[in-house]
Amino acid sequence: MVFGFCAKCARPKMAVFQAFGGYQTRAGYGVLLGFAAAPICFDLKNLKYWLGPVAWDLTRCQSAQDQSVGMESSLVIIPVLNEVSYLWPLLNNLRAADPLIPVWIVDGGSTDGSVQRARLMCMKDPHLNLLINENRSQAHGVNMAAQCAYRQGYRYMIRMDAHAEYIHGFSTQLLRVLCDKNADSVTVPLIAMSQQVSGWQAANAKLQRSRLGHGNAAHRQNTGSGWVQHGHHAAFRLVCFQALGGYDTRLEACEDVDYDRRLIAAGGRIWQAGQLAVHYYPRAAPLGVWAQMWRNGKARAALWHKDKQWPQIRQVLPLGAALGLCMVPFSPLVPELALPAGLYLGTLCLATLFIGPRAALLAFVSHMGFGLGLLFGIFSIRAASAKARHT
């Protein structure tokens, strides 16, 4: 019996063989040692992996192992919340290109039948699994999937959104980019589109493609490929993701922004693959847009407080618009106070000529939601800090 290591899965295995009639001769022992040493030599590139997380150094987490691993070392996770209408088309598209890649659906408390649909699909697809995220938030769900995948020996995690469309062979091309560029994470441009010719979703998609919606964020436009500071998450090295502790689950949103900042600060590198742009379906209801932007505003305030960094101008403008409207009731006393609100509303009226009245109205809803959420988040943090100082 020979105790060796499997070069494919980097785990111990028992190999039984006989060389030239037995182990009694010196030649037999030589062959024995040669065959036993070969898989270990082939697997030295995976030494850090099968020894476990020992003093992991981010600058060295990418190595020659990329040249020998393939799709068998990766999996796809799909965070889901009430997206039953999108699941089936996404899985069909994915399976047409990658029929064997493991796919984990991570449900965060759907009430529209997504769980039932996922279970039916799992019965037909042996490589499809359903995980229930009892903590509900997307950060918790991704962290849970990443931890399970890392323990099972996966090295790369591909994240896909249910409410999106991907090019054929997306996962294979994405993994190739990650390995070729020796990156720690790969992001992709996120371009809004609609299933409707008209209606609120079409208006929201048009808004998200304009500067009033994305604020000139680079990853919301197809600006090409290159090294970036942030983008829409698509692929991770699990060793890097785990070493950084995954997403910060204390954040309601913007956990991707926080992760990218920590990754860059630790010496990691993020590559944006412009050729793999994702087209996604935004929210269709104004109330849903408001709730999303309110949550994003609060999370952005928490992120500023955590990082102690000055915000970008495009993130402050919605707050300025909200404060400008709040000053309108005092304009009879000081007429100049109406100027900011007038300038903002005039800009929205002008925007209707280019993006239409519905998109302009959604711009108002999203700006107010983000601005007031940001203001609420700032005051909440200050109140919590003051309370902590007095206890």
Locate the predicted segments by residue:
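A conserved acidic beta->alpha catalytic loop
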Residues: D107-Q116, A164-I167
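Conserved donor NDP-sugar-binding/catalytic core segment of glycosyltransferases
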Residues: G169-A202
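A recurrent flexible, glycine/aromatic-enriched loop bordering the glycosyltransferase active site
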Residues: N216-F236, E252, V278, Q309-P311
